[in-house]
Amino acid sequence: MASAVGKGVTAFNTIKNIISELKKVDKTFSPNSAQYKYLMEQMKADQVTTRRYSKAENESESVAKLYLSYIKGTRQLNELQERYKGGEKSVEEAAAIVGLKLPEQKKL
């Protein structure tokens, strides 16, 4: 019985983290959204299905953790791309950053 409660708590935390990540990614995400309703339906359906049919007891929890990892990684990638977008610096700018000065080019 204690292990079932522990599994429920971990599954709940995973779902809570997924919801948190979805809120960060999609500002319109709310309990009224289709994504939220689908997530809750799957969680409720899984409680019954896992006990009856699943070969691996925590298979759906593993899938949920994988999905959480995917959402989190995608969000972090987007944040990094947004932060560092803008292209590369010119040779002159890069040299100036490290305190170097390029020799002057003679005009022909």
UniProtKB/Swiss-Prot annotation:
Entry GO terms, CC: mitochondrion
Family note: Belongs to the FMC1 family.
Name recorded for this polypeptide: Protein FMC1 homolog
